Swiss-Prot record:
Keywords: Acetylation, Apoptosis, Cytoplasm, Glycoprotein, Isomerase, Isopeptide bond, Nucleus, Phosphoprotein, Rotamase, Secreted, Ubl conjugation
Species lineage: Eukaryota, Metazoa, Chordata, Craniata, Vertebrata
Keyword Secreted attributed: yes
Name assigned to this protein: Peptidyl-prolyl cis-trans isomerase A
Modified residues (Phosphothreonine): T93
Amino acid sequence: MVNPTVFFDIAVDGEPLGRVSFELFADKVPKTAENFRALSTGEKGFGYKGSCFHRIIPGFMCQGGDFTRHNGTGGKSIYGEKFDDENFILKHTGPGILSMANAGPNTNGSQFFICTVKTEWLDGKHVVFGKVKEGMNIVEAMERFGSRNGKTSKKITIADCGQL
Protein backbone atom coordinates (compact mmCIF):
# COMPACT_ATOMS: atom_id res chain seq x y z
CA MET A 1 0.00 0.00 0.00
CA VAL A 2 1.27 3.44 -0.91
CA ASN A 3 0.86 6.11 1.75
CA PRO A 4 -1.58 8.86 0.70
CA THR A 5 -0.45 12.39 -0.16
CA VAL A 6 -2.61 15.42 0.60
CA PHE A 7 -2.07 19.12 -0.08
CA PHE A 8 -2.90 22.49 1.47
CA ASP A 9 -2.95 25.67 -0.63
CA ILE A 10 -2.05 28.34 1.92
CA ALA A 11 -3.20 31.97 1.77
CA VAL A 12 -2.13 35.01 3.81
CA ASP A 13 -4.94 37.56 4.26
CA GLY A 14 -6.53 35.99 1.16
CA GLU A 15 -3.39 36.21 -1.01
CA PRO A 16 -1.94 32.89 -2.23
CA LEU A 17 1.32 31.91 -0.50
CA GLY A 18 1.87 28.44 -1.96
CA ARG A 19 1.26 24.72 -1.64
CA VAL A 20 2.38 22.31 1.06
CA SER A 21 2.01 18.57 0.44
CA PHE A 22 2.15 15.89 3.12
CA GLU A 23 2.82 12.17 3.12
CA LEU A 24 0.48 10.50 5.61
CA PHE A 25 1.92 7.44 7.35
CA ALA A 26 -1.11 5.16 6.89
CA ASP A 27 1.24 2.16 7.16
CA LYS A 28 2.00 3.01 10.84
CA VAL A 29 -1.04 4.99 12.04
CA PRO A 30 -3.90 4.13 9.64
CA LYS A 31 -6.73 5.57 11.75
CA THR A 32 -4.99 8.91 12.40
CA ALA A 33 -3.84 9.21 8.77
CA GLU A 34 -7.35 8.45 7.48
CA ASN A 35 -8.85 11.16 9.70
CA PHE A 36 -6.47 13.80 8.28
CA ARG A 37 -6.94 12.53 4.71
CA ALA A 38 -10.75 12.68 4.88
CA LEU A 39 -10.68 16.12 6.55
CA SER A 40 -8.40 17.30 3.74
CA THR A 41 -10.76 16.06 1.01
CA GLY A 42 -13.90 17.19 2.86
CA GLU A 43 -15.60 13.99 1.74
CA LYS A 44 -17.57 13.63 5.01
CA GLY A 45 -19.14 17.07 4.55
CA PHE A 46 -16.70 18.92 6.84
CA GLY A 47 -13.00 19.52 7.04
CA TYR A 48 -10.01 21.80 6.72
CA LYS A 49 -10.91 23.87 3.65
CA GLY A 50 -11.28 27.53 4.62
CA SER A 51 -9.94 27.02 8.14
CA CYS A 52 -6.97 28.88 9.61
CA PHE A 53 -3.69 28.29 11.39
CA HIS A 54 -4.70 29.89 14.70
CA ARG A 55 -1.35 29.38 16.48
CA ILE A 56 2.11 29.84 14.95
CA ILE A 57 5.22 29.97 17.13
CA PRO A 58 8.44 30.62 15.17
CA GLY A 59 11.14 28.08 15.95
CA PHE A 60 8.52 25.57 17.16
CA MET A 61 5.42 24.85 15.08
CA CYS A 62 2.35 25.95 13.10
CA GLN A 63 -0.98 24.70 14.46
CA GLY A 64 -4.33 24.51 12.69
CA GLY A 65 -7.32 22.27 12.13
CA ASP A 66 -9.97 23.94 14.29
CA PHE A 67 -12.61 24.29 11.58
CA THR A 68 -15.53 24.68 14.03
CA ARG A 69 -14.38 27.51 16.36
CA HIS A 70 -11.23 28.73 14.57
CA ASN A 71 -9.43 29.52 17.84
CA GLY A 72 -7.99 26.25 19.13
CA THR A 73 -10.97 25.16 21.23
CA GLY A 74 -12.88 23.27 18.53
CA GLY A 75 -12.65 20.81 15.69
CA LYS A 76 -13.85 17.21 15.43
CA SER A 77 -12.70 13.95 13.94
CA ILE A 78 -14.38 11.79 11.31
CA TYR A 79 -14.94 9.22 14.10
CA GLY A 80 -16.95 11.59 16.31
CA GLU A 81 -15.79 14.37 18.60
CA LYS A 82 -12.51 12.77 19.79
CA PHE A 83 -10.56 9.56 19.23
CA ASP A 84 -7.84 7.70 21.10
CA ASP A 85 -4.09 7.99 20.63
CA GLU A 86 -3.37 5.29 18.06
CA ASN A 87 0.28 4.68 18.98
CA PHE A 88 3.53 6.57 19.53
CA ILE A 89 5.72 4.60 17.11
CA LEU A 90 6.77 7.69 15.16
CA LYS A 91 8.82 10.44 16.77
CA HIS A 92 9.11 14.23 16.45
CA THR A 93 12.46 13.98 14.66
CA GLY A 94 12.74 17.41 13.03
CA PRO A 95 11.22 20.07 10.77
CA GLY A 96 8.23 19.01 8.68
CA ILE A 97 6.81 16.45 11.11
CA LEU A 98 2.99 16.41 11.15
CA SER A 99 1.46 15.54 14.52
CA MET A 100 -1.88 15.65 16.33
CA ALA A 101 -2.60 18.50 18.75
CA ASN A 102 -4.57 17.37 21.79
CA ALA A 103 -5.82 18.33 25.25
CA GLY A 104 -4.26 15.34 27.01
CA PRO A 105 -4.35 11.57 26.46
CA ASN A 106 -6.89 10.23 23.94
CA THR A 107 -8.33 13.61 22.92
CA ASN A 108 -7.52 13.71 19.18
CA GLY A 109 -9.98 15.62 17.03
CA SER A 110 -8.92 17.54 13.93
CA GLN A 111 -6.24 19.89 15.26
CA PHE A 112 -2.70 19.22 14.12
CA PHE A 113 0.65 20.93 14.02
CA ILE A 114 3.60 21.07 11.63
CA CYS A 115 6.95 21.12 13.46
CA THR A 116 9.60 23.57 12.32
CA VAL A 117 12.27 22.03 14.60
CA LYS A 118 12.92 18.73 16.39
CA THR A 119 10.42 18.51 19.30
CA GLU A 120 11.43 15.32 21.10
CA TRP A 121 9.68 16.42 24.33
CA LEU A 122 6.37 15.76 22.53
CA ASP A 123 7.25 12.08 21.87
CA GLY A 124 4.79 9.77 23.60
CA LYS A 125 2.28 12.61 24.09
CA HIS A 126 1.30 13.54 20.52
CA VAL A 127 0.68 11.10 17.66
CA VAL A 128 2.99 11.72 14.70
CA PHE A 129 1.18 10.72 11.48
CA GLY A 130 2.87 12.42 8.55
CA LYS A 131 5.54 14.72 7.18
CA VAL A 132 5.90 17.57 4.72
CA LYS A 133 6.71 16.13 1.30
CA GLU A 134 7.03 19.40 -0.63
CA GLY A 135 6.65 23.04 0.38
CA MET A 136 8.67 23.24 3.59
CA ASN A 137 9.65 26.71 2.32
CA ILE A 138 5.95 27.65 2.53
CA VAL A 139 5.80 26.43 6.15
CA GLU A 140 8.89 28.56 6.88
CA ALA A 141 7.17 31.55 5.24
CA MET A 142 4.08 30.95 7.43
CA GLU A 143 6.31 30.99 10.52
CA ARG A 144 7.14 34.64 9.87
CA PHE A 145 3.52 35.60 10.64
CA GLY A 146 3.66 33.96 14.06
CA SER A 147 4.77 35.25 17.47
CA ARG A 148 6.10 34.00 20.82
CA ASN A 149 2.54 33.62 22.18
CA GLY A 150 1.29 32.03 18.94
CA LYS A 151 -0.92 34.90 17.78
CA THR A 152 -0.61 35.51 14.04
CA SER A 153 -0.06 38.97 12.54
CA LYS A 154 -2.08 38.04 9.43
CA LYS A 155 -4.81 35.47 8.76
CA ILE A 156 -3.16 32.27 7.52
CA THR A 157 -5.77 30.03 5.89
CA ILE A 158 -6.10 26.76 4.03
CA ALA A 159 -7.68 28.20 0.88
CA ASP A 160 -7.96 24.77 -0.71
CA CYS A 161 -6.96 21.22 0.16
CA GLY A 162 -7.39 17.68 -1.07
CA GLN A 163 -5.68 14.45 -2.00
CA LEU A 164 -3.05 14.13 -4.73
